[in-house]
C-alpha cells in the first residue's frame, strides 16, 4: 500500500471523526472529547493535508478555521424566492391567519389543518446548496430574488455541515441531486458576550443579531471563524418526494446533521397554537439564544403550493412576534456623561419602575439626536422597553399625557466635567469634549480602563480611589500611577498604611503584565483585546509600533484603515512622549517577551478553568502557564469549557463541570501537560 493510499484512508477516518464530534458538541450538546482532544484530531488532519495537498477537498473540516480573504461577495440568484414572513403582533392576528388558511383549504376539500409551530430565531436568513451532499454555495437572502455569495464565511460556522451523510442523501435527493437548506445564522448569548468583551466600548454590538449580520460580511473568514456563530435549519428542498410534510422535513434535517431548534411542535387546533405561544413567552428567556417570536407554517407542503404567496410573503405561514417588555415611567432628568474618549452620552434619570424582574431608574439616550427624535421634555411620561438582553431604553414619549410644567431639554454646550466648549464633528451624531489632556472625566475613564481586569488588572484601583487621585492632581495619566508614594496615598479618604501598601503592591505586580495587555490598556480608539494581540505579534515592541506607517498597519490582520489611522493619531499626540518616558522608567513591558523554545503549545485553543486551591502554583501563575501555551482561562463553566483543573476544596464549579461532561483533571495531570 502506497503512502498516499494510507494517507487517504487516515484523512477519511479523521474527517468522519471530526464531523461526528462537531455534531455532538454544537448540535446535540453532548461532547465526548475535550477541546484539547478535539484540536489534536484537527491538527492531525491539517498535518496530513499539508503533506498530501492533492487530498485536500473543499468539504474538509480543516476548512472551517477560515483564513481566506474575500474582496467582494458576488450576487447569486436564488432557486426560489426567499420571501420574508408576514409579522403579527397580536393573538387576534394569528387567529385571523388561521381562519383564513382554513377557509382556503376548505375550498380544496381539506378539513384537517395541521400547523407546525417553531420558535423564531432572531438571526440572519441564509440559503445553502448541497450538490451530491457537499456544500457548494451559501448565500444571504438579499432582496429575496438574489443574495450575496458568502460561502467561505459560512464554512466557518460549526453547525453547518460541509458534507452530508452519503447514504441518506442518495436516498432523499431528487433528480437534480441538489438539496437546498435554509435557515438562520445566529449568535448564542454566551458567544455574543464573549465577542463584546473583546472589543472596545465604542465598538461593541448592540445585540446578537447586529453582531451576526456584521460578522457574515467580513472579508477575513479567519475573523469570522473566531466569532463563533451558529445555524438553525428550518427549510429543506430538492427531495425525491416533494410531498413530504414539513414536520418530517425538520426530522430529516436533524438526521442530516443540522440543528433544528428542537422545540417545534405539530398543532392541530387554534387552542394548541395559543398554548404553544403562551408557553414559550416565559420559557424562551431560559434558552441560550435569543428568540423573538413563534413561526406558524402549514404542514402540508403540496397545499402550500396551491395557497401560493403575495409579492412579499407566503400565504401559508406567519410570524408572531412577542411584544417587548414595557413599562411606564417619568423622565425626571437628563445627565450628560463623558466617556474616556470624550464622547458625550445623555442618560435618562427615570422614576424607578419594575421591568423584566429588575428595578430600572436609568436608561441611555445614546445621543442628542435620539432626544430630538423622541421629542422628549423633562417630566414627560415615557414608555421604556426591554427586549431580549438589550439594555432598557426609552422608546416612546406619551405626548397626550405631557404635563403643563414640562421643560425642554437643551443640547449641551460645555463639557459637564471640565467646562470646555463641546464640538460636534461633521457627520457625527455625538458631541464630544476636545479637552482630552485636562478633562477629569476623560482622565478618570482612561485610568479605570488601564486598571481593568482585561488590561493591567490593578484590582485595588477602583472608582472612588481614581476619583480622589484625579481630583487632587496626583495622577493625570497611567504613567503617574507608578510614581505614587505611600505618604501621598495615606492622606486620601478612607486610606490607611495597610490599604496604601496594598495599592503599591498591586501596581508593582502589574509591571509584569505583557506588552499585549499594555497595548490594550493604553485605550487606543478601536483597539480591543484581539486587535492588541495582532499588533503585539506584528510589531513586537512599542517603538516598532509607533514607527509603523499607516499603510504598514493596514496590512496587519484585523487592522483596517480606520484602526490604522486611529493608531497613528494616538502616537502623534503631544502627550505621548511624556507618557512613554514614564512607562519606560516604571519598567513596564514595552516589548513582547522572547518566545521560549522549550514552551510547547499543548493548550492551543483550549479553554481552561481553575477551581479550588493549587499546591504548586498560585492562580495567576497557573493562568499564565496556560496562556503561554496558547490556551485561554475563564472564570465560569459552560459546555464550551475544554478542561477544569480541580485543586483542593473545589467549589460548585466542579459539580457543574461534571454535570456538563467537561473534562476534569487534577493538579498533577495539569502539570504533566505543561
Swiss-Prot record:
It holds the Pfam family DNA_ligase_ZBD. NAD(+) binds at residues 35-39, 84-85, 118, 141, 184, 297, 321. Its cofactor is Mg(2+); Mn(2+). Residues 598-674 form the BRCT domain. It catalyses: NAD(+) + (deoxyribonucleotide)n-3'-hydroxyl + 5'-phospho-(deoxyribonucleotide)m = (deoxyribonucleotide)n+m + AMP + beta-nicotinamide D-nucleotide. GO terms for biological process: DNA repair; DNA replication. Its EC number is 6.5.1.2. InterPro entries: BRCT_dom (IPR001357), BRCT_dom_sf (IPR036420), DisA/LigA_HHH (IPR041663), DNA_ligase (IPR001679), DNA_ligase_AS (IPR018239), DNAligase_adenylation (IPR013839), DNAligase_N (IPR013840), Hlx-hairpin-Hlx_DNA-bd_motif (IPR003583). The active site is at 120 (n6-amp-lysine intermediate). The keyword Metal-binding applies. Zn(2+) binds at residues 415, 418, 433, 439. The keyword Ligase applies. GO terms for molecular function: DNA binding; DNA ligase (NAD+) activity; metal ion binding. One of its GO terms (cellular component) is cytosol. It comes from the Bacteria. Keywords: DNA damage, DNA repair, DNA replication, Ligase, Magnesium, Manganese, Metal-binding, NAD, Zinc. DNA ligase that catalyzes the formation of phosphodiester linkages between 5'-phosphoryl and 3'-hydroxyl groups in double-stranded DNA using NAD as a coenzyme and as the energy source for the reaction. It is essential for DNA replication and repair of damaged DNA. Belongs to the NAD-dependent DNA ligase family. LigA subfamily. This is DNA ligase. It comes from Pelodictyon phaeoclathratiforme (strain DSM 5477 / BU-1). The gene is ligA.
